[in-house]
A protein has these predicted regions:
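Metallo-beta-lactamase
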Residues: 10, 24-32, 103-106, 111-199
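Short, hydrophobic/aromatic-rich segments at coil-to-beta transitions
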Residues: 1-4, 99-105
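Residue-level detector of beta-strand structural context in well-folded domains
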Residues: 14-16, 93-96, 115
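Active-site HxH/HxHxD metal-binding segment of metal-dependent hydrolases
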Residues: 30-100, 192-197
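Short, compositionally biased "basic patch" segments
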Residues: 1-19
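Short, glycine/acidic-enriched capping/hinge loops at junctions between secondary-structure elements
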Residues: 13-16, 28-29, 37-40, 186
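Flexible, charged surface loops at secondary-structure boundaries
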Residues: 18-21, 41-47, 67, 120-121, ...
Length: 200
């Protein structure tokens, strides 16, 4: 698991690398720098990775990154139109499972095509994009702001997500938003998922 520096092209958002076989994944777009591109090539090695986008908020300068790497991109179908020159580009509607067993779920609210990515045990990780945002050390919660697409849908998506996660799984949470509020932490325990942020 690898966390890239905050991406100023996506409001300081976070991009994660998960080294799986046979298909490692890059979740959301890191900063377009030579350091990022070099790290990605080294992490990939001889494998053929895929880029997973959790929402339009995580696109950053994806087209330029994808041009340099040539990796296929997977995005929820509602936001494919935002990436007209990205090839190869694949879409999904409600659910998707990758070659390495990652499970994607459409969770609209923050944006029309928001989704989450669940890595089952033994990884046991939930990449929640902007659906859950850091608001304090060890705490993630939904945040309503000017860019929120549809707040009631976001709350419905959170309820759907709780039911979708296997009952015997309590995955660690990874946000695609800026992580400053976590005060140096990266991963948040499942118990840190709050349905309402106290400062909202």
């Amino acid at each position: 698991l690898w966390l890239f520096p905050p991406n100023r092209d996506s409001q300081g958002g976070s991009s994660w690398w998960l080294g799986l076989d046979p298909e490692p994944v890059l979740v959301d777009c890191p900063p377009l720098t030579e350091a990022s591109l070099t790290a990605l090539r080294q992490l990939a090695g001889t494998r053929s990775p895929r880029i997973l986008l959790t929402s339009r908020e995580g696109h950053g300068r994806l087209r330029r990154v994808q041009e340099r790497l040539g990796w296929p991109v997977l995005v929820q179908e509602q936001e494919a139109y935002l990436l007209p020159n990205v090839e190869p580009l694949e879409t999904f509607s409600e659910h998707h499972t990758t070659a390495s067993g990652l499970r994607l779920l459409w969770t609209p609210g923050p944006t029309p095509g928001s989704c989450v990515v669940f890595a089952p045990p033994p990884k046991n990780l939930l990449f929640c994009g902007r659906l859950l945002t850091p608001w304090g050390p060890g705490q993630l919660a939904p945040m309503r702001h000017a860019r929120t697409f549809h707040w009631p849908r976001q709350l419905n998506s959170l309820a759907k997500l709780r039911d979708w996660i296997p009952s015997d799984a309590s995955p660690q949470l990874l946000s695609g938003a800026a992580l400053g509020a976590l005060r140096g932490e990266r991963l948040v325990p499942f118990s840190g998922w709050s349905d309402v942020a106290e400062n909202c």
